[in-house]
Amino acid sequence: HKKKYELAFIWIDEAKSITGNNNPTIRNTYAVILFNANYDKPNSPEVLSTLEESMEILQRCYNDDYRKIYHARIFAEQSIKFKSKYPDVSRKRGYLELSMKWLESELKNRPNDRWMNNLKRSIQRNLR
C-alpha cells in the first residue's frame, strides 16, 4: 500500500474539508504527503515549488499548534531530505537552521530524548 499518493490526497482533502483546514495535524499530514509524493520526481521548478509549499505548511503548523515537538520532528526530517535534493535552495531558505532552532527549543523540555538528540546531530552534520 505504499506510495498511493492520489488516494492519500483524496482522504486528506476530505479531512481538510470537514475541519475547515484549521487542524494542524491534518495540515501536517497533507504537507508530508505533498513532500513524499513529489520528492522522488526529477528536479524541476514544479517539484521545487511543491517541496517548498510543504515546508511552508509545516512552518505554519509549528507556529499554530501546541504540539510543537511533532511538527519540529517532521520539519527536521524533511529539511535533511530537501537539502539532499536542492542544497543551494535549502541553504538560502535556512530550513536546517530553523530545524536546529526548533529542536534545541524542544530539547530544553526533553534533554534526554534520544531520538531528538539523534535528529539534532543529523541536522548538525548536514549544516557543515
Language-model features: where?
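Amphipathic alpha-helical repeat scaffolds of TPR domains
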Residues: 1, 20-40, 63-85, 101-104, ...
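Internal alpha-helical scaffold/solenoid segments in large eukaryotic proteins
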Residues: 1-16, 24-29, 33-35, 52-56
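Short amphipathic alpha-helical "recognition" segments used for binding
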Residues: 6-10, 81, 110
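Alpha-helical junction/boundary sensor with strong preference for TPR arrays
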Residues: 12-15, 19, 51, 58-65, ...
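Generic low-complexity segments that are intrinsically disordered, proline-rich and/or Lys/Arg-biased
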Residues: 43-46, 112
